[in-house]
Amino acid sequence: VYVQASAGTGSGFSDAEYEGAGATILGTIADVYAKAEMIVKVKEPIAEEYPLIKENQLLFTYFHFASSEELTHAMIERKAVCLAYETVELPSRALPLLIPMSEVAGRMAPQEGAKYLEKPLKGRGILLGGVAGVKPAEVLVLGGGIVGTQAAKIAAGLGARVTIMDISLNRLRELDDIMPKNVVTQYSNEYNIREAIKTADLIVGAVLIPGAKAPHLITREMLKTMKPGTVLV
């Protein structure tokens, strides 16, 4: 096992700990690509890495090919064998390697959105949870999967009034059971989205089609009906 020098520093793991576990530390990423048959990393290769990839070299990482035509063509040209974390499925169709990333993304979405509702960042000066005498923010979450569920929980926990939409009635029933009273569920269709975005202060897009690009649920025409300063995450 080869590990690039300082690869674990950001996560709190020193080179010495990797060496103690039996790994060999290599000075540069080029050294790792040159020696290893399989590359394991967190994010997709960047352009500087493309020339380092050898034919039939196995890469195991998050790729998100659907969102990057350049990366897709680069991996084809390099004749790499690519295993994408985000498409690894259990027999239940669950995506075990995508779930942790989705949990983080969902929890961060309301935080990031709330930031851009603040006046210092040219927002409308809205507090998600409101204060005495002031209404809380209206938050719309599109998609009731892992990201959407976590986003709705955090926004609701901060006191916002949350609407979460999904195309699965079974999922909406589950969410109805587990969410607090300031979260309402609604079936997702064009009409309901069109009406909900008119009053939303913060909109979180959380729709997933495994291995494919997420659909565009909000059109340019719909954007014109939003309140000025509405934040989309």
Task: Identify the residue ranges that each predicted region occupies.
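Glycine-rich phosphate/diphosphate-binding loop of Rossmann-like nucleotide-binding domains
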Residues: 1-13, 122-208
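Rossmann-like NAD(P)-binding element
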Residues: 30-47, 180-217, 231
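Structural alpha-helical scaffold elements that stabilize or flank donor/cofactor-binding regions
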Residues: 31-32, 52, 196-197, 222-225
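Helical hairpin unit composed of two closely spaced alpha helices linked by a short loop
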Residues: 220-233
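Residue-level detector of alpha-helix initiation sites
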Residues: 44, 104, 145-147
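Glycine/serine-rich phosphate-binding loop and adjoining beta1-alpha1 elements at the start
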Residues: 47-138
